[in-house]
């Protein structure tokens, strides 16, 4: 049951992943969101754009499944730290925010203790640095903010646009993510 629910919830999340990244970019730019959450969101975007993924050894849609899960962890923390701003963003992007609790429950139900691997990756988001641009600078410095905006939109054009059929096909093989995550838990 937990696998089916996980796939059911993550299918639309991956189909709209590009839209979700734009929503995360709006969080980075929103001064009503606490700085810690904004920096974590900027780090999440840096991770999505420039890393090889949070789940070792997977490619394509499944690689970005890890990224989608990481974004959910960032949103969960934001909900705790900036509930008013979270609610405001939820009104603008309900398709991303409304299923968050269910997605987190499904993630924990399916991945179990493997979630810790993703949590450890997310903890490093505030310290990420790419091409001389740090996550913290992306909320403080207009040049860094513009660079992040451009980098996100370039990634959306070049690599992050998933066809619904591709998502459905690849999520049928979602169990491929379990072993790589389990190997990281054991470390």
Q: How would you label these PLM feature ranges?
A:
Residues 97-187:
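Intrinsically disordered, low-complexity, charge-dense segments enriched in Lys/Arg
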Residues 25-28, 49-52, 75, 79-82:
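A structural signal for well-ordered alpha-helices, especially hydrophobic packing surfaces
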Residues 1-19:
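Polybasic, low-complexity association/targeting segments
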Residues 61-92:
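Membrane-interface alpha-helices
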Residues 42-71:
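Membrane-inserting effector segments that mediate pore formation, membrane fusion
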Residues 32, 59, 79-86, 115, ...:
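Long, hydrophobic, amphipathic alpha-helical segments used as structural scaffolds
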